[in-house]
Amino acid sequence: MADGVFQGAIGIDLGTTYSCVATYESSVEIIANEQGNRVTPSFVAFTPEERLIGDAAKNQAALNPKNTVFDAKRLIGRRFDEESVQNDMKTWPFKVVDVDGAPVIEVEYLGENKQFSPQEISSMVLTKMKEIAEAKIGKKVEKAVITVPAYFNDAQRQATKDAGAISGLNVLRIINEPTAAAIAYGLGAGKSDKERHVLIFDLGGGTFDVSLLHIAGGVYTVKSTSGNTHLGGQDFDTNLLEHFKGEFKKKTGLDISNDARALRRLRTAAERAKRTLSSVTQTTVEVDSLFEGEDFEASLTRARFEDLNAALFKSTLEPVEQVLKDAKISKSQIDEVVLVGGSTRIPKVQKLLSDYFDGKQLEKSINPDEAVAYGAAVQGAILTGQSTSDETKDLLLLDVAPLSLGVGMQGDIFGVVVPRNTTVPTIKRRTFTTVGDNQTTVQFPVYQGERVNCKENTLLGEFDLKNIPPMPAGEPVLEAIFEVDANGILKVTAVEKSTGKSANITISNAVGRLSSEDIEKMVNQAEEFKAADEAFAKRHEAKQRLESYVASIEQTVTDPVLSSKLKRGSKTKIEAALADALSALQIEDGSAEEYRKAEVGLKRVVTKAMSSR
């Protein structure tokens, strides 16, 4: 990589199943990885020798299921005891354990048991995306705009920002995926001037968002947003997998439920079948020697696939209804319905959506896999002053808070301070008071959600307002100030108004929230892992070079014509040097330097022998 630092910021779509990176240098470019793929699997694998990220990790998943981690986005910012986490754990081959209420992934790496937070796994994927960009740009990348589902809550957003920090990136902004896609659509279609209402339908590998935007004169205003942070292509694959498991059991009497390798192979076949059925109406699924020597073969029609996922497909229309209701807009007022996310390629999903909008033609002008990274790169260029075109220079994004924010009041009633779909950044205030005479401390639990009962919302943290002057109940005026920044991340402060003094306020750490010390430690660990990866790669290359050189010299020595030209003494010396080189290759954990020395030693003897012929 060349010297120098890239002045702009890359855009990263950190996906559940695949990630994508884009850069802006006079125009947007989606950057392909070393395999030539424009999307990279969000997979990290750990082996006794090395760590693999992306295609290399996914390709060996069936051979190493327990140490191949994916779906980190379905864990990030969540509690271990959440229902979705518990359900997912039943389908994952890797181990997830409870550490102080947070889910932590446990794997075997370099011969040891290691634990990684979802933030660390995500940071490894982000590092990979950063390296893909650096290889193309030829400069060091330090800044990024990272996207998240619009429906991500505060904890999930903060955890994603932390993952960026662990990977060594300065995360300039966390932006919502459908909003990023809207930028790609607006710019790509050259339609950012015409005033219109656009509905972004974003169904990816693991998450689902619907956002309704008003676009006019380069100003993108999100009117409302809804979704499901736990719905996507993975769930359709799981339903297919369950169906195939049943078929296999019916035919053979064998249950593969506890065999991680067989499950991985069958899931891969299910995913392939799902993709195929987007373009044909029938396919055959074959897996040789799936379990206990038995092959698996089944035919699958598109109709059967649709039937297996009918309830999930239908559920995608609920957030569509919700955003229209929240924005107080009728479906006839929607000018365009834009498809984003790989799962929108499914014909049945498209038909349901088109029918809902009375046969409206859906907008497919943008690449559903790349649109989000495209929009993030544009936002990165704007934030770093690198955007050059008139279209992007004047572009303004006005997004919203996806879920209401507020405090728990007496009787566990949720007191909303920031209603959902409030444009961010925003500052909202609400006054509270004491419930007991001479009360000097009030505890404010901060929640995010839409339910009246606090217990059914997400607890983000708690703070104590202390040193309140003793007064009769109901007299003190306590003002809670909720500040939501452009990333959708919350900061809460409080003031005791009657004396004009601001009071101490600390938000205690929410479960799984990383402190700055934690992040620093993880940054250092990430550097160590990277160094270990590089050392392994160098060692592997040096060993391969030595092996191929040894093979070519062995050929020379054993070739009657070539060896007859060598002096007897020279041939003996070469054979001795060859034996030394072969011994070096036998060393299990030889270093790159040892292999290099063995190669140099052998070359020296060979060169001398050849020149003295």
Swiss-Prot record:
Residues 516-612 are annotated as: Lid domain (SBDalpha). A motif (Nuclear export signal) lies at residues 574-582. It comes from Candida glabrata (strain ATCC 2001 / BCRC 20586 / JCM 3761 / NBRC 0622 / NRRL Y-65 / CBS 138). It comes from the Eukaryota. Its main location: cytoplasm. Keywords: ATP-binding, Chaperone, Cytoplasm, Hydrolase, Nucleotide-binding, Protein biosynthesis. This is Ribosome-associated molecular chaperone SSB. Residues 403-613 are annotated as: Substrate binding domain (SBD). It is found in: Cytoplasm. ATP binds at residues 16-18, 73, 205-207, 271-278, 342. Residues 1-391 are annotated as: Nucleotide binding domain (NBD). It catalyses: ATP + H2O = ADP + phosphate + H(+). It is an enzyme of class 3 (hydrolase). GO terms for biological process: translation. Gene3D superfamilies: 1.20.1270.10, 3.30.30.30, 3.30.420.40, Actin, Chain A, domain 4, Substrate Binding Domain Of DNAk, Chain A, domain 1. Its EC number is 3.6.4.10. GO terms for molecular function: ATP binding; ATP hydrolysis activity; ATP-dependent protein folding chaperone. One of its GO terms (cellular component) is cytosol. Ribosome-bound, Hsp70-type chaperone that assists in the cotranslational folding of newly synthesized proteins in the cytosol. Stimulates folding by interacting with nascent chains, binding to short, largely hydrophobic sequences exposed by unfolded proteins, thereby stabilizing longer, more slowly translated, and aggregation-prone nascent polypeptides and domains that cannot fold stably until fully synthesized. The Hsp70-protein substrate interaction depends on ATP-binding and on allosteric regulation between the NBD and the SBD. Belongs to the heat shock protein 70 family. Ssb-type Hsp70 subfamily. The gene is SSB1. Binds to ribosomes. Binds close to the ribosomal tunnel exit via contacts with both ribosomal proteins and rRNA. Directly interacts with nascent polypeptides. This interaction is dependent on the ribosome-associated complex (RAC). Interacts with SSE1. Interacts with FES1. The keyword Glycosyltransferase does not apply. Residues 392-402 are annotated as: Inter-domain linker. SUPFAM superfamilies: Actin-like ATPase domain, Heat shock protein 70kD (HSP70), C-terminal subdomain, Heat shock protein 70kD (HSP70), peptide-binding domain.
